Amino acid sequence: IESHGLRWSVVESLPVCEAVKYGGAERDRLIENYKNSLANLGRCGIKTVCYNFMPVIDWIRTDLQHPWADGTTSLYFDRTRFAYFDLHILERPGAEKDYPDPLLAKVEEMGKVISEKEKNDLIETIIVKTQGFVNGNIKEGDENPVKIFKKLLSHYEGIDRAALRENMRYFLSAIMPVCETFGINMCVHPDDPPFQVLGLPRIVTDEVDIAWILLSL
């Protein structure tokens, strides 16, 4: 790429393993692997590394090719469709408490007309395609992606914002010496969308969260 006047200086992303986020027994080993990856990137001249600390599910979309009137398409997030996925496909216990009554009414109406193909498309879009692209926990061809996804969610039972913040602080404290050695800036991707989903805590949603990250080390 340098022969074409370009320079490779940014990596997006270097994914953080789930066990690091929920504080699993193997997190120290995984953090060491992460530090080695950072060092290797640093030796290649990389100065900016993007990452995120979103539990289980990365950026969320309900449609990867939403059509618009001018003939273009884009990624799209429809909260009603996502709520339907949460309530009637995942069947997450207590999920109804996370949505206002008007939205629940829309979900009920949607349930009367949604086709099996549309349900499968939601599973493919929210679980398989997005997550397979981001971190490979779930991939095309997996027999029961919903079951796998539920198991991933189960690791976060009892993990609240405070616990997730502490796990993020632990991770950043461990990797910063490597970043300083190679002059690497860590660039955190904000939670997308910036609010709690699927009962999971989100800790990079606004300026208060960003201030906490900058002051936590």
Where do the protein language model's features map onto the residues?
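Conserved, mostly hydrophobic/aromatic
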Residues: 41, 49, 186-189
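Acidic, His- and aromatic-enriched active-site or binding-groove loops in soluble protein domains
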Residues: 34-36, 67-99, 204-216
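Acidic/histidine-rich catalytic cores of soluble enzymes
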Residues: 100-217
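Glycine-rich anion/phosphate-binding loops
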Residues: 22-40, 163-171
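Acidic (Asp/Glu)-rich catalytic clusters
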Residues: 1-9, 39-45, 176-183, 213-217
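Hydrophobic, ordered structural segments
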Residues: 46-47, 54
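Surface-exposed, active-site-proximal loop segments in enzymatic domains
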Residues: 14-32, 57-71, 149-159
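Active-site-proximal loop/turn and secondary-structure-junction residues that shape catalytic pockets
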Residues: 14-15, 53-57, 190-196
